[in-house]
UniProtKB/Swiss-Prot annotation:
The lineage of its organism: Bacteria, Pseudomonadati, Pseudomonadota, Alphaproteobacteria, Hyphomicrobiales. It comes from Brucella anthropi (strain ATCC 49188 / DSM 6882 / CCUG 24695 / JCM 21032 / LMG 3331 / NBRC 15819 / NCTC 12168 / Alc 37). This is Large ribosomal subunit protein uL2. Belongs to the universal ribosomal protein uL2 family. The keyword rRNA-binding applies. It comes from the Bacteria. PROSITE patterns: RIBOSOMAL_L2 (PS00467). Gene3D superfamilies: 2.30.30.30, Nucleic acid-binding proteins, Ribosomal protein L2, domain 3. Keywords: Ribonucleoprotein, Ribosomal protein, RNA-binding, rRNA-binding. PANTHER family: LARGE RIBOSOMAL SUBUNIT PROTEIN UL2M (PTHR13691:SF5), RIBOSOMAL PROTEIN L2 (PTHR13691). Part of the 50S ribosomal subunit. Forms a bridge to the 30S subunit in the 70S ribosome. Residues 222-277 are annotated as: Disordered.
């Protein structure tokens, strides 16, 4: 889908660039595949703010997305492509031969009327799901599982994908968008193709209000605060903070490595940081 630019009738439209969604379904989602979604405002179960600068935003309905794709060897037809406010990608409504309905992440080049199927030995075409062990090397995939049966976790955002670059002792070697190469069990399912809406990275909100509509409040810099609120706060006139960047709680940030998951280090063959050297 293309990008839309506007004549600057108002200041907020001068820089505005949005994705043209005219090709998507304009009605409401399937009621049986949705549930209510309450606003958290960045607060946890005790009512304290755990994520700053969140709150407000337009009301949403949550759509249940089938990330597992375990309805094997049952052909489904794409009924329509829909917008989903809870993610950057578009979603596709699938009607299976037995009458069941499901939402899946829509890959690029998937159109209304196309057939999709999940199975151990199915065609390599966009929207089909199969184990990584069944795919030819070089295949572009998305919605990749990290544990068999857990559901897709990798490459689910708009325009993202991973590439199967090799195999090693029952494991598949994937190259991710970040440049990282990692091992994933060959029994893990993945969907063929890249995720839809690749132009998402080119949008320009044009005004602060659009971020507020999404539930994002103004992100205040530490140097603009008082000393009581942030380690960078205070000072006479404008200051640069006077120390290496830290979080409001004094921990180093902006480039400081924070990864501490030693148990999965063995699955990372090439770090995403090596690419930059």
């Amino acid at each position: 889908m293309a990008l839309k630019h506007f004549n600057p009738i108002t200041p907020g439209q001068r820089q505005l660039v949005i994705v043209d969604r005219s090709g998507l379904y304009k009605g409401k989602p399937v009621k049986s595949l949705t549930e209510g979604l309450s606003k958290k405002g960045g607060r946890n179960n005790t009512g304290r703010i755990t994520v700053r600068f969140q709150g407000g935003g337009h009301k949403r309905t949550y759509r249940f997305i089938d990330f597992k794709r375990r309805k094997l060897d049952v052909v489904g037809t794409v009924e329509r492509l829909e917008y989903d406010p809870n993610r950057t990608a578009f979603i596709a409504l699938i009607r299976y031969e037995d009458g069941e309905l499901a939402y899946i992440l829509a890959p690029q080049r998937l159109a209304v009327g196309d057939k999709v199927v999940a199975g151990n030995s199915v065609d390599v075409k966009p929207g089909n799901a199969m184990p990584l062990a069944s795919m030819p090397v070089g295949t572009i995939v998305h919605n990749v599982e990290l544990k068999p049966g857990k559901g897709g976790q990798i490459a689910r955002s708009a325009g993202t994908y991973a590439q199967l670059v090799g195999r090693d002792q029952g494991m598949a070697i994937l190259r991710l968008n970040s440049g990282e190469q990692r091992l994933v069990p060959g029994a893990c399912f993945a969907s063929v193709g890249a995720v839809s809406n690749p132009d998402h990275g080119n949008i320009n909100d044009g005004k602060a209000g659009r971020s507020v509509w999404r539930g994002k409040r103004p992100h205040v810099r530490g140097v603009a605060m008082n000393p009581v609120d942030h380690p960078h706060g205070g000072g006479e006139g404008r200051t640069s903070g006077g120390r290496h960047p830290v979080t409001p709680w004094g921990k180093p940030t902006k480039g400081k490595k924070t990864r501490s998951n030693k148990s999965t280090d063995k699955f990372i063959m090439r770090s995403r940081h090596q690419r930059k050297k």
